[in-house]
Amino acid sequence: MEYTKRLLVLEGLLSTLPDCQGWMIAKCRFSLGNRKMKTSDQLPLQILKKDGRLAKIHICSFAGEEKDLLDVTLINPGQRMTLGSRENMETEKEDHLFKVTREETDRYLREVKDQNPIHQGEGAIVPGFLMANKILKQLSPQIPFQAEFRFLTPLQIERSGWLEFLSSDEENDLKIEAEKALKKVQKIHLKTPQNIILKAEITEYKE
C-alpha cells in the first residue's frame, strides 16, 4: 500500500473519536514500517488521556507484516485561537511555496470522514494532518520512517506560506553516527511572514 494511503488509514481512525469537534492537533508522530509488535498495539485506537482541554491518542494499523503508528495530542483551543495577518509573502521564498486550497481540503475531509467545524466556512483552517501529508509527499521519505510535527499556529485555507529546509547540523550528524539504524534526519519549518506554523522532523531508518 502506498504510504500516503497508509497515512489516511491512520488519520481516518482519529475521526471516529467522539466529543472532539472543534479541537486542534498540537503535535503528532507518525511511524511507518515499524516491525516491533506490542500487545497493547492490537487495539486500533487507544485514548491514553482525555480531559476538557487535552487528549492523547495512540493509533495503530497494519500494512501486511508492517505496523504503522500514530500518536496524537489534541487541544481544545476554546476562544483563544488566533490567526496571523494576511500580509504579502516575501518574494524570495517562492521556490518553496506552500498553500492548501479549499478543493484539496474538501477532498481530504471526505477521505478521512472529518467533520470538524474548524475546517468549514469563513476563516476555516487547514487540517494539521493534511499539512503533514503534503510535506511528506514533497519529501518522499523511504519506509521505514518516523515523522514528528509540532503545530504552533493555525494556517487558513488558501493562505500561502513557505517551507524552510534546515540544513543538517552537527547534532543530527552525531545522532546518525551514533545510531546505526538511522539513515537520514531532515528538519523543516512551515512559515508565514508573521508566524512559524509548524516544525517537523523526519527520520528515515535503514531496513
Regions found by a protein language model. Give the residues of each.
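Generic alpha-helix signal with a bias toward terminal, lower-confidence helices
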Residues: V112, K137, G161-L163, S167
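A broadly conserved detector of short glycine/acidic/proline-rich loop/turn motifs that flank catalytic sites
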Residues: R102-E104, L155
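A conserved, well-ordered hydrophobic junction motif at loop->secondary-structure transitions
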Residues: M1-I25, L97, E104-S140
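HotDog/MaoC-like acyl-thioester-processing domains
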Residues: M1-G12, D19-L97, L155-I157, E164-E207
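Catalytic-pocket segment enriched in acidic/His residues
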Residues: F129-F149, P154-I157, S168
